[in-house]
């Protein structure tokens, strides 16, 4: 089921609006300083502009906390519309929770200044979606007639169906409750939105459209599991754009078919080619995507939706990543896709299953820092992978693929570069120059407990070398209170920024 946005309800959907400062200017830029600092080594002419910070209110619209995925679409003359997902949830997570559930903001930016000219809620928190993570926008470059925003729930929580939910109901196996893990789409022009259950019930990090020149729409989606190491890569194929909205596509899971040494038995969990640790820097594997039964993809079996898909993937020897994050296609050759895996401490082989496991405390892991994978799709068939290799590895000192990054999370490409944002900890933004092959640090998040996220190529709107990104502070909140149950409710600090790095 899809729903069209009711703009008349927006005032009622703005949480805490009467308690927050209201900014009534036509064009607005946050008075807060940028939440990132450019590296001294960036080219001359580099700059960062802070656009809007969490908690700031414009004509009744409040920019919520935990901004994450970003998608861009043409706005009215002289502007670009920016859609931003918010990774919020009222379900307690490590002792804290947000004041509201996930939402999507729509913010118009003036192309000449980057200032905000208008803002509204594109998908309201009352729908009860949880933890919208990264996101992407598909448009004419990806074969879409309408600009379509893709995001998804990064959670496996089992919850009551929200009172305001209009696009989904309970799951049969756990009724009257439902489990998180929906992929969600939104039409940038009409405001219509809908979950796409057949895209897999999993911890969706991001979904992107891959314009490989095939006669089908091909969407890749990544599993940012909370139970690492047990993530998978999925492909959703649809005959046309409308079939995505009506969920008439099919879901497929990645499996290796061949290593450098020759073909492997795809069904054998001891084939030495079914997980992250089996693929080492310098290796070049091949693979295929195998079909996921529709009832399992949609989560309508007798098991909880995510449990059913995970069990099916293990039974069918689907390639096991550790914790998949963002992904982006190469704008020079769209059949090439870069995929981030943030890694995890204490990950080692499991001799009993032929897969991976996390060892006990003190175990020396083999994938602490994560990787970037490079996947090349077949020219004629999106279900065939001609090359699957390690592109950058944070745990392989001495190898040509070694990059001293820690836990890559969000990524995007331009015609010249790959940008990689680290998770919390180091929280650096890495710039990889396709022309020279070099890696360098472009910027770092100021708050050591925060992270940057959602980076997207904005060169079509703000000129070459332009990127829009956001920051999740984690270490500070705009507003917080402890509820009767002892849970810290918060509106976490965050910020949207425009970064320009000449040549990137």
Which role does the model predict for each range below?
Residues 2-11:
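Bacterial N-terminal signal peptides that target proteins for export
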Residues 26-504:
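Sequence/structural signature of beta-propeller domains
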Residues 11-22:
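Bacterial N-terminal signal peptides
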